[in-house]
């Protein structure tokens, strides 16, 4: 007797007896369906024989098959199962893949035509399977399973055309089902059999299940390099230093593309015959229209002499000391005017302006949250998203002593030794020194006509204090790199690099998050996240607690400018943990706002981040502001850009390219000191060559990629970027060509002063005046020749002139002055400019 179904009541709803498909309920429903099917087959009347060979999709030929009229006593479960349970358990992405495989919709961008309907698709699958399993009563041939699902979904004909051949569509069987004539599969797949012992592979002693599990795990750097171990005698630093030459990226060579067969119109051809300074200046004026007329020669004077007003809390000023003058031997002057500024001097007003922007006025954008609970959750998400837990458990060795010794070897010239290191317990670690960066970072926006860039600030400990904390954080960072997953890249150190072999940025979606005011926006929440992550990496808990305690409240002081102010949790831009801490904070915020499993490659460096994925990224970037107190901006349109460099595909290797707009600005820098042998200029030239070393491997495809990225990033013309590459090729060829971009007033003065008297002659106009003792010119210099050669003649002329009337001598002098003024040009050199230029 069939038990009645449970009635609807509040009690049955709470105890789960109503509305829940329990195994007993499913078995009861299947038993009722089986009984109904057996009763229907007992009353079944045979139909005329029908050839159903064409309705069965199989490759081998079938002679014929007729539906038997003999009743059966049992019914297979395949007749009563709905066939859609597997699709109901699929995830949305898997169900969408099955929909595209069967229905084959037309994709226009990200839009499907026909649109995807989950309920309609599962119903179509169930109905198609029911039609194939039911006895066929028509003489027409049904479509294949995939085509039948598409026909039901699109509401078209279920049968093939009688005259037309069957469309050859690539199909795969429905997962778990096999359609064969005369029998129905239950979806069971036989297990693999071992070829040696004929046993099931999972029960065979030859099968290594642990090896299969390790091969399925995600590969990390710790699998490639056995960097350390408890039973070895080689420490971490020694092995890394030995592996350094072998871990450098291999540069692939390329062949130059052949010349095209078609002829380019000369009027459309780009000028590539010669590179000139004026062409580069014209490109700069076109790309950066407000930079060509920028001149900050007297900017420092305006700042210090004009009225100044600012609003900051808890600022201490000491103006009893004068700002000492910085000795300056002169700088090289650029030929190009690219908007670069002079070096800034840390005066009181300049420092207050920088502190106002970089350290004061901390934004309060986040909401009130439970810091203790949420910081642990963010640290746990960080560990699961980026780190290989097995590699972290095995890599339990932090080599601090070797790194400390290597760090001290960097300072032999400065005289720093182990005896000079102070006792950290006797030092007040809450006090930080402060200074501004003399070099101002060039801006790429067209705002120099209304705005002046503010210099960045540096908050740092003394060298003796930093040298004791840096080895510990270096060791932790090395261990952190070894335990990262393969898809996570940190472009720093000996293992990682900006160049990625075997990965293409083409046909990928990019995600770049721009975090502004990153240092001063960090608060107590970020400090607690770093504390949990440092403890997970193996940092001793007392040291972690000690380090975080004197970052809760600190005091910065600029001794030169006489400015001091208290700060709290914000990032110290010059201590031993700056880069490591910024990278950890950026990765933790990114993992909380986005699911990292959707990305194929993740790059982090300080406050810069870049991610690549095959599908459009899905996440909630608003949490950067509401939770982490950051001013975040998702860059649109997104380009592969990180650390002020573009990524492009060169010779099957993803390499970085420095943006041309910043390199143009660096060609007009004003910070190169003057030297007689051009040592500083040559060092600047070698830095320029190192940044543009990728040009030797560039092809036309790389130039096109860089032009497109340039247009998308800066909203400038890509043709200008391609034109500047020719200038870069010229100035990186040799040092003599690079010297054309700079000059010095001192060099021109020395050039003028090296002229010989015989080569450089200046004729002066003489004006004879009546004197009592003789004739003297207007310059006051006696032009009489030496007495040893013309003593007699000069004396006789003087005596004769005394006997002549005064009027006659005056007329003669006037006639001589008129003759000299008409014959000789008036060229004079003032004595005060004897060391200057002559024009």
Swiss-Prot record:
RdRp catalytic domain residues: 508-621
Signal peptide (residue range): none
Pfam families: RdRP_2 (PF00978)
Keyword Ligase: no
InterPro entries the record matches: Bromoviridae_RdRp (IPR047309), DNA/RNA_pol_sf (IPR043502), RNA-dep_RNA_pol_alsuvir (IPR001788), RNA-dir_pol_PSvirus (IPR007094)
An example Gene Ontology biological process: DNA-templated transcription
EC number: 2.7.7.48
Family assignment from sequence similarity: Belongs to the ssRNA positive-strand viruses RNA-directed RNA polymerase family.
Protein name stated in the entry: RNA-directed RNA polymerase 2a
High-level lineage: Viruses, Riboviria, Orthornavirae, Kitrinoviricota, Alsuviricetes
């Amino acid at each position: 007797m069939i038990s009645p179904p449970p009635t609807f009541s509040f009690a049955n709803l709470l105890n789960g007896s109503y509305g829940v498909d329990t195994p007993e309920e499913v078995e009861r429903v299947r038993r009722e369906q089986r009984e109904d099917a057996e009763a229907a087959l007992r009353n079944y009347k045979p139909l005329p024989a029908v050839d159903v060979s064409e309705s069965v999709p199989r490759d081998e030929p079938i002679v014929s098959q007729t539906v038997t009229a003999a009743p059966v006593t049992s019914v297979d479960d395949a007749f009563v199962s709905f066939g859609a349970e597997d699709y109901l358990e699929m995830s949305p992405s898997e169900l969408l893949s099955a929909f595209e495989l069967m229905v084959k919709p037309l994709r226009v961008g990200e839009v499907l035509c026909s649109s995807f309907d989950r309920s309609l698709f599962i119903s179509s699958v169930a109905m198609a399977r029911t039609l194939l399993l039911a006895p066929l009563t028509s003489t027409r041939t049904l479509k294949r399973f995939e085509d039948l699902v598409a026909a039901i979904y699109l509401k078209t004909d279920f049968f093939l055309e009688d005259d037309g051949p069957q469309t050859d569509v690539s199909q795969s069987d429905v997962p778990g089902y096999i359609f064969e004539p005369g029998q129905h599969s239950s979806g069971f797949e036989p297990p693999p059999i071992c070829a040696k012992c004929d046993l099931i592979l999972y029960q065979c002693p030859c099968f290594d299940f642990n090896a299969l599990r390790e091969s399925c795990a995600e590969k990390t750097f710790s699998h490639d390099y056995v960097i350390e171990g408890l039973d070895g005698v080689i420490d971490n630093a020694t092995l890394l230093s030995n592996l350094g030459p072998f871990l450098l990226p291999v540069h692939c060579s390329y062949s130059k593309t052949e010349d095209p067969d078609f002829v380019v119109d000369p009027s459309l051809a780009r000028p590539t015959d010669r590179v000139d300074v004026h062409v580069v200046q014209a490109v700069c004026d076109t790309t950066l229209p407000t930079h060509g007329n920028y001149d900050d020669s007297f900017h420092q004077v305006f700042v210090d002499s004009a009225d100044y007003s600012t609003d900051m809390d808890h600022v201490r000023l000491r103006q009893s000391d004068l700002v000492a003058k910085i000795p300056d031997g002169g700088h090289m002057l650029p030929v190009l005017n690219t908007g670069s500024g002079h070096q800034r001097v840390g005066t009181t007003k300049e420092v207050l302006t920088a502190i106002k922007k970089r350290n004061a006025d901390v934004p309060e954008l986040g909401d009130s949250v439970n810091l203790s609970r949420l910081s642990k959750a963010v640290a746990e998400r960080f560990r699961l998203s980026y780190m290989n837990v097995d590699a972290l458990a095995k890599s339990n060795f932090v080599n601090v002593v070797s790194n400390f010794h290597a760090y001290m070897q960097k300072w032999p010239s400065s005289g720093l030794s182990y005896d000079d290191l102070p006792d950290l317990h006797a030092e007040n670690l809450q006090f930080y020194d402060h200074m501004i960066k003399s070099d101002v970072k060039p801006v790429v926006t067209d705002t120099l006509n209304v705005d002046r860039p503010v210099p960045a600030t540096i908050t740092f400990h003394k060298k003796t204090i930093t040298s004791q904390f840096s080895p510990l954080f270096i060791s932790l960072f090395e261990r952190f790199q070894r335990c990262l997953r393969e898809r996570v890249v940190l472009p720093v150190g000996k293992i990682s690099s900006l160049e990625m072999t075997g990965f293409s940025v083409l046909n990928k979606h990019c995600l770049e998050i721009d975090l502004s005011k990153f240092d001063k926006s960090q608060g107590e929440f970020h400090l607690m996240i770093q504390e949990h992550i440092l403890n997970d990496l193996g940092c001793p808990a007392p040291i972690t607690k000690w380090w975080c305690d004197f970052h809760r409240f600190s005091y910065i002081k600029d001794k030169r400018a006489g400015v001091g102010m208290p700060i709290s949790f914000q990032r110290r831009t010059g201590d031993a943990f700056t880069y490591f801490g910024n990278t950890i904070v950026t990765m933790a915020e990114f993992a909380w706002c986005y699911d990292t499993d959707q990305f194929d490659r993740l790059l982090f460096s300080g406050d810069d981040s870049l991610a690549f994925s095959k599908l459009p990224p899905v996440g909630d970037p608003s949490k950067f502001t509401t939770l982490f107190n950051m001013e975040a901006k998702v860059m649109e349109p997104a380009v592969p850009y990180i650390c002020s460099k573009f990524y492009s595909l060169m010779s099957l290797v993803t390499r970085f390219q420095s943006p041309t707009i910043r390199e143009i600005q660096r060609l007009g820098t004003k910070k190169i000191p003057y030297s007689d042998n051009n040592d500083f200029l040559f060092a600047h030239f070698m830095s320029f060559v190192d940044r543009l070393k990728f040009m030797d491997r560039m092809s036309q495809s790389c130039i096109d990629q860089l032009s497109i990225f340039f247009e998308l990033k800066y909203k400038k013309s890509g043709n200008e970027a391609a034109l500047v590459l020719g200038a870069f090729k010229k100035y990186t060829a040799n040092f003599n060509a690079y010297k054309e971009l700079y000059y010095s007033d001192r060099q021109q003065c020395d050039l003028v002063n090296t002229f010989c008297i015989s080569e450089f002659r200046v004729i002066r106009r003489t004006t004879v005046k009546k004197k009592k003792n003789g004739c003297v010119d207007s310059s006051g210099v006696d032009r009489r020749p030496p007495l040893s050669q013309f003593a007699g003649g000069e004396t006789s002329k003087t005596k004769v002139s005394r006997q002549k009337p005064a009027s006659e001598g005056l007329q003669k002098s006037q006639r001589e002055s008129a003759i000299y003024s008409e014959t000789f040009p008036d060229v004079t050199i003032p004595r005060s400019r004897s060391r200057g230029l002559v024009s």
